[in-house]
Amino acid sequence: MATAALRQIWIPRFLPVPWFLCGSRRYASSSFKAADLQLEMTQEPHKKPDPSQPLLFGKTFTDHMLMVEWNQEKGWGQPRIQPFQNLTLHPACSALHYSLQLFEGMKAFKGGDQRVRLFRPWLNMERMLRSALRLCLPSFDKIELLECIRRLVEVDQDWVPGSMGTSLYVRPVLIGNEPSLGVGHPTRALLFVILSPVGAYFPGDALKPVSLLADPSFIRAWVGGVGNYKLGGNYGPTVLVQQEAQKKGCEQVLWLYGPDHELTEVGTMNIFVFWTYEDGVLELVTPPLDGIILPGIVRQSLLDLARTWGEFRVVERKITMKEFLRALKDGRVREVFGSGTACQVCPVHQILYQGKHFHIPTMENGPQLILRFHKELKAIQYGSKAHEWMLPV
């Protein structure tokens, strides 16, 4: 598929870059071109995973990767698809010392027709560009990068598992590669993309609900920070809190914010509450994109689907623990769930908050909405339902 043709299809789907990231210094006009893509096929292909064995997330990688280098003097170099290999970095590399790094997560699915399709990848490209500009990393043409990624997936498409629930995880990364201990705008950068076949998050379609630790002493993101960008520095500090949750018998963390203990995210997922609101109206609510919430691709997809159905109110609004617990006590909460690329939709059945366990009746209610979202997403992602969200490889 020619890049020019793809550009006409995708341009209307991209969101505008925030005005404060559009200065001339940050928003360079140069970019690499998919037409210049170089291809070096591996001479030592890896053994593909046994389809009968479970695939652990992020442990297996395909034969090839995409690499593009950038420096301030010459701009972007030629993109190349090359054999999967280790990186060589200077010990003073700015990504290692000052977290000048960002990443994306997206998936390719193989349908019953054996065709491989990417799920809403232009949204990932938009989010990746916003993250790059926030870190003063080089700009790039979203459509050119997307075409390079499509070509990479095409080269390694035999690695895409074919059973329901499995997929090929696509991990684009952009890092500052400045060989200096000074903190500043990097003059070198490296963009690379690796691929990993992954198994079903819920084997056999059996949804497993999770319990959450809600501790307001831990904060994931704050107003004026970078919680709405997909940066590596947002994830490392959450590991300790995740361990604390596990020590208390919880699988995930419910991140709270502010004096009112606003619900923000679940682990690395966006959070949704399906309930009857105080005015008696059935609604699906998720926190708004106010600067501390990551604009998840699946989050947006669930909102889009629910609004298309038009069967209940769909809102983006702040949710406090006080109003949530009041609704729980009144029996107005139907389902609570997280959404993300890894799990798609993950049910929640319990919250540990201020020393008390609160049961959420998600599973007792079907969970009808979660199952409906799962069914609809699978139909779209695996090609049984034609949809503009999917990009054929």
Curated annotation (Swiss-Prot):
This is Branched-chain-amino-acid aminotransferase, mitochondrial. The modification N6-(pyridoxal phosphate)lysine is found at K230. It catalyses: L-leucine + 2-oxoglutarate = 4-methyl-2-oxopentanoate + L-glutamate; L-isoleucine + 2-oxoglutarate = (S)-3-methyl-2-oxopentanoate + L-glutamate; L-valine + 2-oxoglutarate = 3-methyl-2-oxobutanoate + L-glutamate. Catalyzes the first reaction in the catabolism of the essential branched chain amino acids leucine, isoleucine, and valine. May also function as a transporter of branched chain alpha-keto acids. Its main location: mitochondrion. The gene is BCAT2. PANTHER family: BRANCHED-CHAIN-AMINO-ACID AMINOTRANSFERASE, MITOCHONDRIAL, SUBGROUP IIII AMINOTRANSFERASE. Residues 1-27 form a transit peptide. It is found in: Mitochondrion. The modification N6-acetyllysine is found at K322. GO terms for cellular component: mitochondrion. It comes from Bos taurus. The keyword Cell membrane does not apply. GO terms for molecular function: branched-chain-amino-acid transaminase activity; L-isoleucine-2-oxoglutarate transaminase activity; L-leucine-2-oxoglutarate transaminase activity; L-valine-2-oxoglutarate transaminase activity. Homodimer. InterPro entries: Aminotrans_IV, Aminotrans_IV_CS, Aminotransferase-like, B_amino_transII, BCAT-like_C, BCAT-like_N, BCAT_family. Transmembrane segments: none annotated. Its EC number is 2.6.1.42. Keywords: Acetylation, Amino-acid biosynthesis, Aminotransferase, Branched-chain amino acid biosynthesis, Lipid metabolism, Mitochondrion, Pyridoxal phosphate, Transferase, Transit peptide.
